[in-house]
From Swiss-Prot:
The lineage of its organism: Bacteria, Pseudomonadati, Pseudomonadota, Betaproteobacteria, Nitrosomonadales. This is Phosphate acyltransferase. Pathway: Lipid metabolism; phospholipid metabolism. Its EC number is 2.3.1.274. The keyword Zinc does not apply. One of its GO terms (biological process) is phospholipid biosynthetic process. It comes from Nitrosospira multiformis (strain ATCC 25196 / NCIMB 11849 / C 71).
């Protein structure tokens, strides 16, 4: 089956200067993929000419007359820009002309517009943002990263289902492990929502590891880390800040004097290998899970290489049949919940002693 990806060319800090070259580069390396470039035709065609790209049936342009700014409110984007490149790309997924949408645009606008256009899957209350982070053991998937600041225990359970299904769909892991991010491993730790979520996850039939702490994320203790969007976003931004600080300190030390500069040259192969392992561009592309279509949010400041990885993530999710697998797993969970509820109702009431 040929997979078609709709690319919001106008989104992100660099717009078509990054999205168009990144898409062309991806197409050249992946002959089984088709792409629809959505945005202002004149601008897109200008970028294609600059690349010397010749006409191909695998790439077509779909016009959209409006652009969602990176600082616009979700309400403005949703109500006032019905012909934005973001919304048109999502409509292509809704109509079946494309199997996935990739956008580097305004996160809030993409969340709101995606939910409005595509709707959530049956049994899913809220979509969640999932990202891949490097760990000592490889990588882990973390969700939610900011789509939902306030969550119920049931929402966290749904995040666990979606995260586990994402991993099993893409990486062929039959029962990926799930950790619930908490302030301690003990069952008594955490607020009422987290405690209840742990109970639901434990009874869900998923491979629930239990509570994990922040340091477990980068240890790679579990395949999936579940948390609400507030906690997840703070954890992610803190990690980014620590990485920037360490990089800054390292550069300062290597530039301190002639001897340290020489040491830096000697250590260059090791430093280069380290940078490749933690290169954030390889992990670009957050999955917006729980919708009736595949949506990938690229980082707004992504360069060409990073945006290419976001397209690749969208293709992997389509190939893995992620939407079908999530729907099936949620249906199973709903059935289990109904059976459990019926069983509890059938139990005789205890007489007071």
């Amino acid at each position: 089956m040929t997979i078609t990806v709709a690319v919001d060319c106008m989104g992100g800090d660099h717009g078509p200067h990054v999205t168009v070259p990144a898409t062309v580069s991806y197409l050249q390396s992946n002959p089984a993929i088709d792409v629809v470039l959505v945005g202002l035709p004149d601008v897109i065609e200008s970028e294609l000419r600059a690349l010397g790209y010749t006409q191909s049936p695998r790439l077509r342009i779909h016009a959209a007359s409006e652009v969602v700014g990176m600082d616009e409110s979700p309400a403005t984007a949703l109500r006032g820009k019905k012909n934005s490149s973001m919304r048109v790309a999502l409509n292509l997924v809704k109509s079946g002309e494309a199997q996935a949408c990739v956008s580097a645009g305004n996160t809030g606008a993409l969340l709101a517009t995606s939910r409005f256009v595509l709707k959530t899957l049956p049994g899913i209350d809220r979509p969640a943002l999932a990202v891949v982070l490097p760990t000592m053991r490889g990588h882990t998937y973390v969700l939610d990263l900011g789509a939902n600041v306030d969550c119920t225990a049931e929402h966290l359970l749904q995040f666990g289902v979606m995260g586990a299904t994402l991993v099993s769909s893409i990486e062929n892991k039959e029962k990926p492990s799930i950790g619930l991010l908490n302030i301690g491993e003990e069952e008594i730790k955490g607020n009422d929502v987290v405690k209840r979520a742990a109970e639901l996850l434990r009874d869900s039939g998923l491979n629930f590891y239990g509570n994990i702490e922040g340091n477990d994320i980068y240890k790679g203790t579990t395949d999936v880390v579940v948390c609400d969007g507030f906690v997840g976003n703070v954890a992610l931004k803190t990690s980014e800040g620590v990485a920037q600080m360490l990089s800054h300190y390292l550069r300062e030390e290597f530039r301190r004097n002639l001897l340290t500069k020489l040491a830096g040259l000697i250590a260059l192969p090791v430093i280069s290998a380290f940078k490749r392992r933690v290169d954030h561009r390889r992990y670009n592309g957050a999955s917006l899970l729980g919708l009736r279509g595949i949506v990938i949010k690229s980082h707004g400041s992504a360069d060409r290489r990073a945006f290419g990885f976001a397209i690749a993530r969208a293709v992997d999710e389509v190939r893995g049949g992620m939407l079908r697998h999530i729907s099936e797993r949620v249906a199973q969970l709903s059935h289990q919940s109904m059976q459990s509820s019926s069983y509890r109702r059938s139990l005789p009431e205890e007489s007071p002693v």
